[in-house]
A protein has these predicted regions:
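Aromatic sugar-binding surface patches on proteins
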Residues: 108-120
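Residue-level recognition of well-ordered beta-strand positions that form the cores
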Residues: 69-73, 85-87, 120, 134-136
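Short, surface-exposed loop/turn segments at beta-strand-coil junctions that are enriched for proline
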Residues: 75, 120-128
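Short, conserved beta-strand segments of beta-strand-rich sandwich/propeller modules, principally
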Residues: 67, 128-132
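Solvent-exposed serine/threonine-rich low-complexity stretches and specific carbohydrate-binding patches
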Residues: 95-110
Length: 154
């Protein structure tokens, strides 16, 4: 159990610490520069359109495909600086209570400053489900998607 915890958490943190400090802390400087750019330009990201099933009219059903498409105007950011995902959870009292699973959307196209993200996912849970779409800054150098502090639900 202790070895598993060490492998899953402490080992990865130790490796990351070494990487961040390497080459005169180059990785740390790159992350800081990227975060400053995100902080400056994140407000420029505008949702142009969202196409999703209307779960207020009919519940999501087991085995059905869930199709989603979101178009974003990226402003000064590159589309690869943005990630989109769908969060699925159990519905209780008209709202999402517990997150059951998330599915990453893919960037399908980018033209004239507008990125199109989409996905198709089979529903593999029975019961009343709800969903939310969230976008967040993406960078392979950061430790988690919440690290930037700019997660936005649309």
């Amino acid at each position: 159990m202790l070895d598993e915890y060490n492998d899953k958490y402490y080992g990865k943190l130790a490796e990351r610490a070494v990487a961040i400090k390497a080459d005169g802390c180059l990785m740390a400087k790159n992350i800081a520069d990227w975060k400053a750019d995100i902080e400056k330009h994140w407000p420029e990201v505008v949702v142009k359109s969202v196409k999703v099933p209307d779960s207020s009219k009919r519940a999501l059903r087991f085995g059905e495909p869930f199709k989603v498409e979101v178009k974003l105007e990226c402003g000064s950011l590159r589309p690869e600086d943005i990630a989109m995902e769908v969060v699925f959870g159990s519905r209780k009292g008209g709202r999402m209570e517990d997150v059951l699973f998330t599915r990453q959307m893919e960037m399908k196209s980018f033209a004239r400053g507008v990125a199109t993200f989409s996905g198709e996912f089979d529903i593999r849970y029975a019961g009343a489900l709800d969903y939310a779409i969230r976008m967040y800054p993406a960078n392979p150098l950061i430790a988690s998607k919440q690290e930037s502090g700019f997660v936005r639900y649309i």
